[in-house]
A protein has these predicted regions:
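Hydrophobic alpha-helical connector segments
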Residues: 61, 75-103, 155-162
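Basic, helix-initiating cap at the start of DNA-binding domains
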Residues: 1-27, 31-40, 57
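Short hydrophobic/aromatic patch on the recognition helix
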Residues: 42-52
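Amphipathic alpha-helical segments enriched in hydrophobic/aromatic and basic residues
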Residues: 5, 24-27, 33-34, 45, ...
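Amphipathic alpha-helical packing segments from all-alpha helical-bundle domains
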Residues: 68-71, 75, 119-146, 156-160
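C-terminal peripheral helix-coil segments that are non-catalytic and often amphipathic
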Residues: 1, 90, 94-101, 134-146, ...
Length: 195
């Protein structure tokens, strides 16, 4: 009986998170309020707070989903690809693809949806970006060990550039109302970024 109830609670939490992400996909939605969310779900605001202690906790749930999705793909890339340079390429491409497929979550990634929210949410996004940068730095070091990059290559600066590129593409995607495809010029831009 308790397992069935826990599953139902989990389903309701997931539905709330999915609804927030869907609402964020609408460029006209400036801010998701609990009142708007409750109206969309056809429940009371009190019903939302039975599942999440605060709105910040709802966004934390979205960030956890983003982390899980991004890093599971990165782990698959690292396991499947031996070339450090190809790992870096695939990781950045996967970040752009994630934005393409998850428009609402991209607004969370660029901080657009977090304006006027708890500052710890932006700190979580910053930590996520730092982890991605560390992963890219490691892939670039592997590329150097394989002879694809010079030993004196500045791995930190290169990894930072790749993260800045991805964040910039996400930003353009969001600010264009999801019209400027993050992967539009990827095949032409990667050779420049790889150097």
């Amino acid at each position: 009986m308790n397992e069935a109830r826990a599953a139902k609670v989990g389903e309701k939490k997931l539905l709330i998170l999915q609804t927030i992400a869907e609402m964020l996909e609408r460029p006209a939605v400036e801010k998701v309020t609990t009142a708007l969310l409750a109206k969309q779900l056809q429940v009371s605001e009190a019903a939302l707070y039975r599942h999440f202690a605060s709105k910040a906790q709802m966004y934390e749930g979205l960030i956890e989903f983003i982390e899980s999705g991004v890093f599971s793909v990165i782990a698959q890339i690292e396991a499947a690809e031996e070339s450090g340079l190809k790992q870096a390429e695939a990781i950045v491409a996967s970040l752009l693809r994630f934005a393409q497929k998850n428009r609402g979550l991209t607004r969370v990634l660029v901080g657009d949806a977090l304006v006027h929210e708890n500052p710890r949410l932006q700190a979580r996004i910053n930590q996520l970006l730092d982890r991605i940068e560390s992963t890219l730095k490691q892939s670039l070091k592997v590329a150097s060990a394989q002879g694809a990059l010079a030993a004196e290559h500045d791995f930190a600066a290169h990894a930072d550039l790749l993260v800045c590129y991805a964040v910039g593409r996400w930003q353009r995607f969001v600010k264009s109302g999801f019209k400027d495809d993050p992967l539009a010029s990827w095949s032409a831009q990667w050779p420049i970024l790889r150097a």
